[in-house]
């Protein structure tokens, strides 16, 4: 009596087809990389790193209300849309986890895993890497900002303009000092 309903539920949980947006998430020590690879926002790419000041971490400043979840670039998605997450890792095993969305997906070097979620409320939602990944593991937050369709379209346009302004001129000749700064 339970086998058929349970099987249908598990199959639906793993069904990543018909997604509105597909985002590749790459775990790095100790940050996340996001590449919007299909749907509105295709071509957007950025890193997400912790911005909590070291003084708070070292107890030299009072802790903020977003202690250890402040990030420089939130992942942005529209409310009510099916978001497919394709996860992998660059170095060690990580796990992209947002409890509010019921998502915990391991990111494993050399493997591509996928899952999906649909955020039903506008707001900012936080998570953490939930796989011990090294000495800075505790400093690897995740922030997802869920916005209206109109706000998402505005964010996409603004982000693409920002990326275009930061893109290099392909004919530019770099000095040695410029190359050193870039790594």
Model-derived regions, located:
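Non-transmembrane, membrane-proximal soluble domains of secreted or membrane proteins
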Residues: 1-183
């Amino acid at each position: 009596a339970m086998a058929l309903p349970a099987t249908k539920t598990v199959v639906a949980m793993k069904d990543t087809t018909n997604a509105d947006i597909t985002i590749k998430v790459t775990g790095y020590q100790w940050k996340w990389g996001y590449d919007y690879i299909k749907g509105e926002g295709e071509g957007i790419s950025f890193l997400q790193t912790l911005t909590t000041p070291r003084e708070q971490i070292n107890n030299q400043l009072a802790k903020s209300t977003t202690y250890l979840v402040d990030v420089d670039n939130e992942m942005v998605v529209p409310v009510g849309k099916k978001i497919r997450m394709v996860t992998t890792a660059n170095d060690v095993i990580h796990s992209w986890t947002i409890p509010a969305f019921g998502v915990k997906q391991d990111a494993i070097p050399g493997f591509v895993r996928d899952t999906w979620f649909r955020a039903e409320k506008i707001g900012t939602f936080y998570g953490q890497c939930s796989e011990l990944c090294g000495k800075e593991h505790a400093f690897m937050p995740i922030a997802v900002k869920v916005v209206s369709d109109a706000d998402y379209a505005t964010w996409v346009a603004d982000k693409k303009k920002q990326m275009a302004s930061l893109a290099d001129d392909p004919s530019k000749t770099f000095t040695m000092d410029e190359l050193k700064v870039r790594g």
